[in-house]
């Protein structure tokens, strides 16, 4: 390899490829090093008996026009090279709890309305939850592209408060508590340890919209 690069990025996952692209777009000579035969990190996919399986990115959120991932992918020139397929907006995810199935719906009002059908006596609790996680994301500069001039970009309360602690404060309904935290396996969270901040960013991300990458997630890396 010629030794005339200004920047060497180690690892070809989504973060590595993104930073390499941004640096190259701004005039730097960049090389990306990957130890494995296939690049892409958790964007990789594999096939078994003709069926494609993603290793990490099974579906994406907030990718409709004006939403955060759409802005990122547009800047990274990814959108023209991938095809998106919308998940069911009335049920983009299902939480199974005690032999009952609960649907997560896209859109804040739709999310509240759908869960309220299962928890008619906890409508205000669900509204409070949706409002809270949306407020957290709106105050995150990485999510909203606002408040970059603020020295303290994280509200200590959102970082120190666990998901379980917060949700226990807004509702005493045990079933609802479990349903609202039912997406924890999506990001390997722990109810008593994972901060509200992390849960809010991920949950609101998918409530806004949810799509799968047609073909497989490695199309993002190939773009």
Task: Report residues per predicted region.
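Short, glycine/acidic-rich beta->alpha junctions
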Residues: 15, 159, 216, 220
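Hydrophobic (often cysteine-bearing) scaffold residues that line and stabilize catalytic clefts
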Residues: 65, 163, 217-221
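Helical element adjacent to the flavin cofactor pocket in flavoenzyme catalytic cores
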Residues: 200-223
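N-terminal glycine-rich phosphate/pyrophosphate-binding loop and immediately adjacent elements
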Residues: 2-131
